[in-house]
């Protein structure tokens, strides 16, 4: 059965009518920088819902390190495992946060290779929101890792002489520190050729920094040349600030130094990452 030309003409709107239909009503306002950032923050948080397996790494890895070093090596590093726990728990919180920052680079690089990056570049919103929202979403990872690690430490016998405020203060300082470090791996995620390169390179950089710090043992037990590296390592200052806050002996110097280092990392790597992101070859 065929349709007559007259019927086609009567059901096909003319160009003027089509423009009227499409232009009816007000267009939505362009997203502000804040709303665009919050949207990408929500997108990052939804990753936990759709990929809950990542919670295994976030929760289990710090707990495994805490149990392993406390009960396998604690007696050798200190007079007893209980004494070593008082030293190591504030340090392992630094390790937990810093290890989570690698997810920033791998998730960003995955978006680039899946084409999500190209789609975002064509949309009319504040482009830095893509990075800022993702990095703010990673704060949830830090909170989960810190909360579970500290909770287990308290169950094992850790004494937080700084009280609740000291523990919360240490967690806030480490969240700021982790946020600043995540910009480094965000820059790496933009330039890396594949997600595996991001994680591989990150481990090569992170493990020497973590182990050549005062997270695991006192610097006095190390050779002189290594002590100089430990003293200059930002991980050491973060661990010291965490210990002082949790044990109620915090001074301005170490906490202020960690915050200054964090501000410096953001000041350097945030603009660099944005520049690399804008100039990224769409191919």
From Swiss-Prot:
Any single Pfam family the record assigns to this protein: ABC2_membrane
Record localization: Cell membrane
Record GO biological process: response to antibiotic
Cytoplasmic side: 1-53, 107-119, 160-169, 219-241, 281-283
Sequence ranges on the Extracellular membrane side: 73-87, 139-141, 189-199, 261-262
Stated role: Part of the ABC transporter complex DrrAB involved in daunorubicin and doxorubicin resistance. Probably responsible for the translocation of the substrate across the membrane.
Name assigned to this protein: Daunorubicin/doxorubicin resistance ABC transporter permease protein DrrB
Recorded superkingdom: Bacteria
Keywords: Antibiotic resistance, Cell membrane, Membrane, Transmembrane, Transmembrane helix, Transport
Membrane topology: Multi-pass membrane protein
Subunit structure: The complex is composed of two ATP-binding proteins (DrrA) and two transmembrane proteins (DrrB).
Protein family (similarity comment): Belongs to the ABC-2 integral membrane protein family.
Bilayer-crossing regions: 54-72, 88-106, 120-138, 142-159, 170-188, 200-218, 242-260, 263-280
A GO cellular component annotation in the UniProt record: plasma membrane
Domain ABC transmembrane type-2: residue ranges: 53-280
A GO MF term: ABC-type transporter activity
């Amino acid at each position: 059965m065929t349709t007559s030309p007259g019927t086609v003409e009567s059901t096909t709107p003319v160009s003027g009518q089509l423009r009227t239909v499409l232009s009816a009503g007000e267009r939505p306002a362009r997203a502000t920088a804040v709303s665009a950032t919050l949207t990408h923050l929500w997108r990052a948080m939804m990753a936990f819902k759709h990929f809950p397996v990542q919670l295994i790494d976030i929760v289990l890895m710090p707990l495994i390190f805490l149990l392993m070093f406390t009960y396998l090596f604690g007696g050798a590093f200190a007079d007893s495992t209980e004494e070593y726990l008082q030293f190591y728990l504030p340090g392992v919180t630094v390790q937990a946060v810093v290890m989570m920052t690698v997810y920033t680079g791998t998730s960003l690089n995955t978006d680039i290779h899946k084409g999500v990056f190209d789609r975002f570049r064509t949309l009319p919103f504040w482009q830095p929101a893509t990075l800022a929202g993702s990095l703010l979403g990673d704060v949830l990872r830090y909170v989960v890792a810190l909360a579970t690690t500290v909770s287990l430490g308290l169950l094992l016998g850790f004494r937080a002489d700084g009280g609740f405020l000291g523990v919360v203060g240490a967690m806030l300082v480490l969240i700021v520190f982790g946020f600043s470090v995540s910009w480094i791996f965000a820059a790496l995620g933009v330039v890396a050729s594949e997600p595996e390169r991001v994680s591989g390179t990150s481990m090569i950089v992170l493990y020497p920094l973590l182990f050549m710090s005062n997270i695991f043992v006192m610097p006095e037990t190390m050779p002189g040349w290594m002590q100089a590296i430990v003293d200059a390592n930002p991980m050491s200052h973060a661990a010291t600030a965490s210990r002082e806050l949790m044990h109620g002996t915090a001074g301005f110097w170490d906490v202020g130094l960690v915050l200054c280092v964090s501000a410096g990392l953001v000041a350097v790597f945030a603009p660099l990452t944005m520049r690399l992101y804008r100039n990224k070859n769409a191919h």
